[in-house]
Structures are given as C-alpha cells and as structure tokens.
C-alpha cells in the first residue's frame, strides 16, 4: 500500500518537482507558477518535491536556491518539500513487488555487451535499443546469470499496442510500444532511476495533473506504462513548450539572468516577475497587467499556447517599471536601501528615503535604477570641472546669487521654490534650462535630476544654500 491516504473524492493535486542540480531558472519558475495556479484555481493542493536521487550533481546549495526562489515568488506549497533520497525504502518496496509480479526482471548485461548490441543494430540500420535478451518470455530459455555480477532491474514494457494520452496543452500524443525498450528502473547498486521514482511519487502523492516542460514528453509513455502495471490511476498531463530567448534560440545563460534570484538581486519585484511569467505562453484576452489573485481566478490550461514562448527582457523591465510606479513608497525605500548602501550613500544624512522614492520612481525600471536615481540625495558632491565650466558661467553667476538670496527666506516647499525660480528668470531674462542646469550641477553634482524644485525641497534649505554659496 502507498503511504499516503487516498480520499474517496480526490481533489486536484499538482506538483513541482525540480532536481537540485542548479538554480531555479525561468523555465522552472514558470512550471512552478502554472502548477501552483492550477491547484489554487480549483481549490486543490500544490506539492513541492525535490528530486535529488542524482547524488553526484545534487547540492544543498541548489536545494536552498530553489526554496529561496519559491519563497521570493510566494509560491507556497501545501505539502512538502518531499525529498526522494528520504523515500528510497519506498522505491525498493515497489521494485520488489514488480519483480514478484513479473512486471520487472533482472538484467545482467554489462556495459560492453550493451555497447556491442547497439553497434550491431546500427550496422544493420536499426534503431539502437535493448534487445530483451534477459526478458522472461513463455518458452524462452534465459542465459545463466554470471557469477559476481549485480544486475539492473528493467521494467517489462508492453511490446504491442500503443500508449496514448490527451495532453492538456498539445492534444493527443501517441507512441507505439514497440518503440519503447525495457527501461532500467533500478541500477546495479540498487538505486532507483529517475523515471521510476517519478512514477511512484506521483502515485503515492495522488497527483492528478502533471504540468511540466515538453522535454518530458518522451518520458511520459514509459511512466504511463509503469503506472498501469502498478494498477495506479494515470494523472492528466500538460506539457509546456520551451521558452526562447530574445533572439529566438533556446533560453540559456547567454540571454541574461540564470536564476530567478538574480532578478531579485537586480531589483525586480516578485509580483512583476509573476505577471511576466504568467504571460509566457498563456494569455487572458489582451490583459497585460494583473495581480496574482486575478491570475489565479483566470488561469486555465485551455489558453496555454502549444508553441514556444519568447522571453523579452525589455518587456519584463517595462512591467517591472509599472509595478514600481504603483508600489508603496515605504516598501520601495526598504528595498532600495541595500542598493544605496552599496552605492556608498550615507542614509543618515539626507531626506526621508520614502519621499525620495516617490519622487524618482516614475522612470525606474528596477529597484537598482531607483537606488541609482536616489543616490544623489545621500552623497558627498563631486561635480566635475567639465560640468562646472560648461554650466556655471560668468553670465549665469549673478542669477545664481539672486536665486540664493530668494531661497533664504521663503517657505521651504516646492511651490515657493518654483516661484523663486520664475522670479529670478524674469529678473535676469533667462530661460529655465540656463538657470536650472547650473543649480543641478552645484547642488547635486549631476546634470540630470528629477524636477529641480522637488529636488531642492527634499535636499533641504541648509544643504542647498551651502552648496550654492560655496560655488559663488
């Protein structure tokens, strides 16, 4: 019996089952999101399973990176994480049952024998495959097991008929059983193989819908046949097409971020990444901006496109910018703080960071860009000699001195500062850029800032006047 209880009326149960051999990448995150959203939409359950039987390549760091990525995206699971390495007893139990029932058998072929077998098949123009020499058949005499050789265990795959399923994304997919050889389900050292563990886990965990990348399509007929041999209910399958990079080739490291957490490090908001991932191969009419609650309400498998989705970094940046513009300023301040500190900003000596974020966030595509725009409010000035020579000319110095005098006594708020600029411009016959640019350079060290009146308001009267007078 499987160790998980089985309700009489099973609810929808999905799973995300990453292998911890690397970081949580964009494709994996989309699979997790769609599996999570499908379960949430139907009031079902979402299971997290870590497929860590590849001991040589699985690392604790990769497991933590996956958990961190899931937590950042807030893809909460109802059960798990389950680790396959903690379920080896269960796989061994099922293998013994299959050996006893005749659904599996021992194979003593050496690596050299298998290589020779494949070479001979290629020479005859045949598809390389296991020839079934250790497969028990009625009336067949098997070779004598060689002494001192530990056998593998192979699944006795049906040899006739077809295995087919109605894929919820790609439509009906069918394989001839004659094309499928007898899969190894346990290695010579007794460890179970990937395809077998997946089957037992999906069975035990009562998974009703398997949503995964289409690189698993070729695994599916083998897994279905094993499930049928076990007398297990076969789940529904939905295979998602691959994600292409901006240039139309398969998404890879050279297209930018390798892991989901790299987007966190670059200053993307998780809700923007969720929104973008949702639109990678799925749509709801023309809707582009929507929160996770709306996504869960809308999500279905019928509107997933069977063709490849194309990742567009600029579109993600645009989406992130929309979310930053709408975000709470206090939250943005907390997110921007580490970036500002990295920029060498002294946050104790400057205006309220939330107020600064409110001023500069309109044009910020990332939190990193937001922090870069805010840095000028929290650092020691170093305008370059070139900027000073270009903008602080003898012609404009009288107007700068006049402006400083007007700024000394007015009420320090944006409207009054703007009025002081207009009065100074009128008195000296200047256009706004002629006065605003040198003020920017002298007060912030930068030729480009947010609106000059708002910038001066946040910097404060004392700091503004000290910097103007120091130059005059």
UniProtKB/Swiss-Prot annotation:
The keyword Cytoplasm applies. Its main location: cytoplasm. Keywords: Aminoacyl-tRNA synthetase, ATP-binding, Cytoplasm, Ligase, Nucleotide-binding, Protein biosynthesis. It is an enzyme of class 6 (ligase). Residues 122-150 are annotated as: Disordered. Residues 122-138 have a biased composition (Basic and acidic residues). It comes from the Bacteria. The keyword Calcium does not apply. It catalyses: tRNA(Glu) + L-glutamate + ATP = L-glutamyl-tRNA(Glu) + AMP + diphosphate. Pfam families: Anticodon_2, tRNA-synt_1c. A motif ('HIGH' region) lies at residues 18-28. One of its GO terms (biological process) is glutamyl-tRNA aminoacylation. ATP binds at residue 253. A motif ('KMSKS' region) lies at residues 250-254. One of its GO terms (cellular component) is cytosol. CDD domains: GluRS_core. GO terms for molecular function: ATP binding; glutamate-tRNA ligase activity; tRNA binding; zinc ion binding. It is found in: Cytoplasm. Its EC number is 6.1.1.17. Signal peptide: none annotated. Gene3D superfamilies: 1.10.10.350, HUPs (3.40.50.620). Monomer. Catalyzes the attachment of glutamate to tRNA(Glu) in a two-step reaction: glutamate is first activated by ATP to form Glu-AMP and then transferred to the acceptor end of tRNA(Glu). Belongs to the class-I aminoacyl-tRNA synthetase family. Glutamate--tRNA ligase type 1 subfamily. This is Glutamate--tRNA ligase.
């Amino acid at each position: 019996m499987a160790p998980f209880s089985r309700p009489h009326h099973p609810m929808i149960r999905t799973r995300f089952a990453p292998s911890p051999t690397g970081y949580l990448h964009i494709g994996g995150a989309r699979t997790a999101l769609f599996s999570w959203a499908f379960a949430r939409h139907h009031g079902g359950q979402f299971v997290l399973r870590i497929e860590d039987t590849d001991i040589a390549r699985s690392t604790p760091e990769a497991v933590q990176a996956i958990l961190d990525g899931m937590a950042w995206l807030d893809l909460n699971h109802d059960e798990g994480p389950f680790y396959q390495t903690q379920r080896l007893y269960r796989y061994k139990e099922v293998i013994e049952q299959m050996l006893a029932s005749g659904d599996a058998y021992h194979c003593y072929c050496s690596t050299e024998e298998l290589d020779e077998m494949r070479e001979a098949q290629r020479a005859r123009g045949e598809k390389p495959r296991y020839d079934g020499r250790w497969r028990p058949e009625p009336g067949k005499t098997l070779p004598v097991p060689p002494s001192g050789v530990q056998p593998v265990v192979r699944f006795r795959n049906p040899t006739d008929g077809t295995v087919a399923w109605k894929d919820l994304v790609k439509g009906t997919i069918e394989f001839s059983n004659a094309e499928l050889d007898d899969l190894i389900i346990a290695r010579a050292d007794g460890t179970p193989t990937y395809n077998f563990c997946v089957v037992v886990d999906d069975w035990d965990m009562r998974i009703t819908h398997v949503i995964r990348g289409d690189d698993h399509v070729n695994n599916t007929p083998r897994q279905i046949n094993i499930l049928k041999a076990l007398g297990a209910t076969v789940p529904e399958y939905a295979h998602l097409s691959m994600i292409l990079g901006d240039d139309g080739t398969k998404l890879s490291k050279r297209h930018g971020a390798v892991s989901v957490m790299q987007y966190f490090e670059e200053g993307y908001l998780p809700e923007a990444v969720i929104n973008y991932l949702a639109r990678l191969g799925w749509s709801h009419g023309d809707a582009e901006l929507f929160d996770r609650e709306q996504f869960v309400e809308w999500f279905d498998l019928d509107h997933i496109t069977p063709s490849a989705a194309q990742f567009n970094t600029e579109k993600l940046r645009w989406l992130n910018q929309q979310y930053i513009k709408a975000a709470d300023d206090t939250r943005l301040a907390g997110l921007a703080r580490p970036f500002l500190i990295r920029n060498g900003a002294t946050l104790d000596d400057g205006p309220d960071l939330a107020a600064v974020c409110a001023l500069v966030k309109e044009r910020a595509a990332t939190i990193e860009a937001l922090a870069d725009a805010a840095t000028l409010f929290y650092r020691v000035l170093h305008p370059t000699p070139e900027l000073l020579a270009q903008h602080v000319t003898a012609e404009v110095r009288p107007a700068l001195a006049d402006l400083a005098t007007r700024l000394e006594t007015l009420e320090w708020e944006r409207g009054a500062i703007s009025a002081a600029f207009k009065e100074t411009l009128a008195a000296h016959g200047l256009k706004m850029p002629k006065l605003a640019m040198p003020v920017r350079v002298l007060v912030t060290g930068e030729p480009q800032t947010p609106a000059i009146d708002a910038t001066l308001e946040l910097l404060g009267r004392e700091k503004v006047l000290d910097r103007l007078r120091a130059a005059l």
